[in-house]
Amino acid sequence: MLDVKLLRNNFEEVKQKLQNRGEDLGEFEKFGELDKRRRTLIVETEALKSQRNEVSQEIAKLKREKQDADAKIEEMRVVGDRIKTLDIELREIDEKLDTILMSIPNIPHESTPVGESEDDNVEIRKWGEVREFDFEPKAHWDLGTDLDILDFENAAKVTGSRFVFYKKLGARLERALINFMMDLHSNEHGYEEMLPPYMVNRASMTGTGQLPKFEEDAFLIEAEDYFLIPTAEVPVTNYHREDILKAEDLPRKYTAFSACFRSEAGSAGRDTRGLIRQHQFNKVELVQFVKPEDSYAALEKLTGCAEEVLRRLELPYRVLSMCTADLGFTAAKKYDLEVWIPSYDSYREISSCSNFESFQARRANIRFRREPGSKPEYVHTLNGSGLALGRTVAAILENYQEADGSVLIPKVLQGYMGGIEKIELPK
């Protein structure tokens, strides 16, 4: 949520920045009109209250002097009724303004590239060499089926499309990746480990920005009004909802493994095969709470933590700075990490690392005090995938495949796999 004072004092500047996002400005313009009416009502109400006070004093004086006060009493009744009417309208406008405010996205940071589509995202750097195969490489869904480590068919029978059973060494590979990522982030990168709830309430989804605008993308348990989490970002960020933190306790850095649940409502027909776009998938998340002046340096470090996972797995990747049109609702600046997937002959997103500035903190009321007794300020929140597990498995299977259909295990994972160096075809 944006600072309402910023909207009121810099309306045209904010409007231009939202235009750079490609936003429909209808609601934003409505905010300006309603806010103008609100200011008019406040001025009128204050004038009427002042008039009421004056009339009240006049009535008291008339009564002390034993004079007829009926006309003044009637005047005060009319003024009072008008104040009540204006107060009702003011409350209704405030409710409408709050609703609109929750639907306005974050303002892009000045360093975010201005663009109209994903084609305008800017490549920052690349790492690793894309492998040249001397045989026809298979897609990960075929490799997983042939190796008997991924079963999409029975998952479709048990649940439906966009689900998978990990089996045998496939399940062990996923578990190895989880342990490797969590160990790296907690032992070397200084993150505190968490295992969060997989269901959250409506206030939590609102706090991180999924609600109210993107409710159709979420899985709702209607009987309880709980949501299955789309990412561990939601419970971990809301861990500090309504908290006032101490300055000396910042930054707070958390890493959390969780299952993630997404309806993929807007993705019909896209990535229908394999692990790239599932309704349920595992992910390791990185979340930070920092002082405002530290958030952009923190974003660079957080992105580096996600990159380190790919480097140790020796998977080729690139980093993109996302343009204003591809920024997402909550971020002021976002980097995407894309890993090379041979079956797509392209890089595919495996992590997003974002600085939300105070956008989420305002929605969730997460603040800190610089000194005891000082006025609380909003923290800046950041998060990043460190990494998405299904896409990491897909990248490993495709990039580490051999001509005989087997798949090598990345060296950094072999200790987590009990020394297994290769997944071979069943005999």
UniProtKB/Swiss-Prot annotation:
Entry-linked Pfam families: Seryl_tRNA_N, tRNA-synt_2b
UniProt keyword annotation of Protein biosynthesis present: yes
GO function terms (MF aspect): ATP binding; catalytic activity, acting on a protein; serine-tRNA ligase activity; transferase activity
Enzyme Commission (EC) number: 6.1.1.11
Pathway: Aminoacyl-tRNA biosynthesis; selenocysteinyl-tRNA(Sec) biosynthesis; L-seryl-tRNA(Sec) from L-serine and tRNA(Sec): step 1/1
Positions that bind L-serine: T231, A232, E233, E285, S385
Domain of life: Bacteria
Residues where ATP binds: R262, S263, E264, E349, I350, S351, S352
Keyword terms of this UniProt record: Aminoacyl-tRNA synthetase, ATP-binding, Cytoplasm, Ligase, Nucleotide-binding, Protein biosynthesis
UniProt subunit comment: Homodimer. The tRNA molecule binds across the dimer.
Comment on protein domains: Consists of two distinct domains, a catalytic core and a N-terminal extension that is involved in tRNA binding.
NCBIfam families in alphabetical order: serS
Protein's name according to its UniProt entry: Serine--tRNA ligase
Organism this protein belongs to: Listeria innocua serovar 6a (strain ATCC BAA-680 / CLIP 11262)
